[in-house]
Amino acid sequence: MSLKDAVKRGLPSSYAQLSALGESVDAIRSQMLTASEARQIHDELHWDISVQLLGEIRALRNELDAHDSQMKMFAWENYRKENESIDDAKKRFYRLLPKATGGMRLLQLGCAKLMGEFDALCRENGLQYWAVYGTLLGAIRHGGFIPWDDDTDLGMMRSDIERLIEIVGDDDRYRITVVYDRCVTCKQIRFLYADTDIPCFLDLFVYDWAVSPDRQKAEELRGLRAELAEEIECDNVLSFWGPSPYYPDAADGADRIRAHFEDCRQKSRDCGVVCDKEKAGGIVWAVDNLNCSRTPWYAYSLEDTFPLKRAMFEGVEINVPANADAYLRSCYGDYLDLPKDIHSHFQHVSHDDLEAGATRDALSGFAE
């Protein structure tokens, strides 16, 4: 059969049939337009309802926030003693909160003991460190660990961390682990006991000297961090870094990862944020650390940081920034307000392991 014959067989045999076919096509087109119009109306209605609901949700949230603030104000006013400020009443409240119990408390006491030894080691060798984040909050607000916190956070200048690593290399009591974390593209540094059965550790975060404490300028480092993560993701040579997101700095191939971080650090100098100590007007959260997108990039003036002060933490005297209040407000806002992460705080050590087995036994004998 020719193409012409095939086309003829597919066409209506009469004008009437052709006309009927045309009417059918018009009807189908009309139905299609009606369906399209219906979808448009549905989308417009859905958008209108969404906008209306969003406005109502925002209004409800504002009302709840206002009510929450009013109730807190009323509660604190009734809680405070005569001639006691609201802030002092809040601190008194936090310091009277029950301590953690069981394995969690053993871990905290073990970390406090380790921190005391770390403090002595740093003082003996002229190294500067200071409490940051939850550890600083605990020192100022609780006089020790926040009851639901299970890790210890300390900040150090890059050169002091490098010296510390050398010192610990000749000290059989302790060890330092340097691990690259692919999940959050960071360099994780921890100070621990040489005994691997003791799970206590101190997280060490790197700070660099900065031209100024200008946070808008420091935000440029966030872009460099994004570039770092993308470069690592696209580096086919790093295919070995996959089964486990944690890769030790001393392992084979780590020099390739290290080179990416060093290149990013050089860019932080080239862009005019990081500088030498002699030219510094502040300090800045280094690109080696993890990046929290919910907060501005941390930068502090020299006056807010140095000279370091001393504060008590679980009976141990530790270093805190010169202006701890400025540090805490930059991280938490009103840090004396009631927290929202009591039950959702991330567990750095398995709490099940703390209640049984070799870990529990090691902590019990160690913390006593």
Cite the ranges covered by each PLM segment:
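Helical scaffold of the NTase/Pol beta-like nucleotidyltransferase catalytic core
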Residues: 50-65, 69-131
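Conserved catalytic core of two-metal-ion nucleotidyltransferases
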Residues: 99-123, 165-223, 232-333, 338-368
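Active-site nucleotide-donor binding segment shared across nucleotidyl transfer reactions
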Residues: 119-152
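Catalytic metal-binding acidic patch
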Residues: 143-164, 315
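Flexible coil/loop interruptions and hinge/linker segments embedded within long fibrous stalks
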Residues: 3-49, 56, 60
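Beta-sheet entry/capping signal
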Residues: 128-129, 153, 310, 317
